[in-house]
Amino acid sequence: MFIPYLDLLASANARKVKITNIKCVRTRIGFRPSLLVKVETDAGIVGIGECHHDENSMGAKDIVLNVIKPILAGQDPYDLERLVFKMSTRTSYYGGNHGIPLHAITGVEFALWDILGKLADQPVHNILGGGPHRKQVRAYCTSRPRDMLSKDSCAEFAERMKKQKFTAAKVDLIRDQRWEQLDNRMMSNAEVDRNARGFQNVRDAVGPDFDIAVHAHWEFDFDSALRMAHAVAPIKPWWFEDPLPIGYNEQWIKLTDRSPVPILTGENLYTRDDFRPFIVNGAVNKIEIDISMAGGLLEAKKIADLAETYYIPVATHNVAGPVATVASAHWAATVREFAGHEAFMNNPLNADGRSCNGDNAVLGYGVDLLKDGYLQFNGKPGLGITLDEKLVKEKYMVAGETWWD
């Protein structure tokens, strides 16, 4: 692991730091439940993290308190890579380094990076992998017009994007079946035609310089995916996301070879092991990494570096709360071939375009997290978060949960 401030991190006083406690509490700050994690040290420095992608956070809480906490007790937070290996090995029989165990590890890893940054008196993006490539991170909004077949609705969407100052958006396809009720992977010609018209309406409304990603939610068989790729080709999409089912298959190579638009996947993939076949076999044009799923900041950096050697740009998938969003942004700043960072604006608190992914007031951030369509850093050490525990406790704890003190 390369850390440019190693002389600070390896000082005699710093090496005496030990992890003394780990606490967690289930919350709902974004649009899904997530587990906030606090890692305490004998130096009085505390790290904050967030475990996401668990429907009620019970699984992640169990793993953090009963598996991870004993592993980290008395350990040196500077041994981050070794500690992540130990956590991954110990939890591997829960799901082979997939699913909730890795979500739990990731939230704790965020907190460890927060501690390292505070000890070095540097923002995380300065000590992760050699420093940042950018001072702010381009965001894209995941949203869509109320009715893509209505030009008026698309015009309203374009005005909203302009007001919030986004230059890119990810837009869901039109489907006859609701996503959660799908019973097959086939798409009718009528659906394909409606999407061709709908996405053309969106393009006409936002103009040629606005990036549009087409979002498919891993729904289609090969034939449907290829027909849809041709249908949306006239709008020159940023990418066509997850057109085939999750997981590597040789059909991804075939689709990428034959598609007239860039193919992307990654939001459901874990660690380098899942990403590697897509990258080395040319099965995609772009990848996106969900930092909360892929294994944390360090693992995601390794994935991005592998992609870079194959000239594959990287974006993020991000449906987590504000804490994990900040952690993800720090990582994104260190990725040279970075395309865009997902921002969710469905919470009314985010409507003005100055925040995203839930109530940013919990961060104690001091500056707007989102400005002119870019994620911002406040220059503070670690993740730059001063968690407003009073606000979280009063408004965002899951019902029946006990506060971590």
Short names for language-model regions:
Residues 1, 356-405:
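C-terminal extensions of enzymes
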Residues 3-48, 52-53, 402:
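Structured beta-strand/loop patches that form or line metal/cofactor-binding pockets in enzymes
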Residues 6, 42-119, 351:
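Metal- or metallocofactor-binding catalytic centers and their adjacent structured scaffolds
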Residues 19, 44, 68, 108, ...:
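Conserved, mostly hydrophobic/aromatic
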Residues 66, 82, 230, 236, ...:
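Shared catalytic-loop signature of beta/alpha-barrel
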Residues 128-136:
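Flexible hinge/switch segments at interdomain interfaces of large molecular machines
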Residues 135-137, 142-254:
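Metal-dependent enolase-superfamily TIM-barrel catalytic cores that perform enediolate-based chemistry
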